[in-house]
Amino acid sequence: MIFFWKFFFVQIDKYDFNNLNFRHIDFTNYKKIRGLIFKENLFKINNYHVNSFEFLNFSKNLGGKVGINVSKKNIFNWFKINKYKLYFLWSSELTARRLINILYNYEFINSSLEKKESNRLKEIILFHIKRLLLEFNNLKYYDVDSYQLKAFVLSSIILKKDFTKVLFIVKKIISYQIDNIGMHKSYNILEHSKFINNLKELKNIILFYNIKNGDFLDEALGKLGLVLNQY
């Protein structure tokens, strides 16, 4: 997939990260995160729930200063030690998951941050967007999962991109993910369900921002739903 945008993050305040929580169904594994969340150096643990920032969903449920401090400390420290690493931590898949989890919890985390901390959080988000789009450019349509696709769309919203090309790419990627009878090509019912959930979130994003020509999502959801109803 050949796709590239030039973007320059020079004025942090011009980017809006509010109202970007479009979560439909929460697939977070809270049971596993519960055993990790209060570890002193959580950010150093080589664990999927840490490296994907899925722990932020648990922190939000904790609420208050405790939840915000857990979120802030581990985002900032994780980024500090991993920013320039090149291995799997910055794969398109993990980058997309982290970006989504930060954006979906942004308003909670940012609610009591000082200006300097808030700017730091924004810089981390923009760094993730940059890394995501650079990786995204090297992927084939069939290599993009629905989380990467959702992160791509959210990034496009933040960067105020023309959605004519964005929707063309979204439609292409979705067509590569579904077979002729409407089954997700993982042929795994859980992944099929997650795919439906992410397409519903994409639909809500498009409706919220009044973006036109997103009807193809209804068609895809209809086919996927018919297959799911057979289980």
Predicted regions and their residues:
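Extreme N-terminal leader/anchor segments
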Residues: M1-N41
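Aromatic-lined, polymer-binding surfaces characteristic
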Residues: K44-L221
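Anionic-ligand-binding alpha/beta catalytic cores of soluble enzymes and soluble regulatory domains
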Residues: K223-Y231
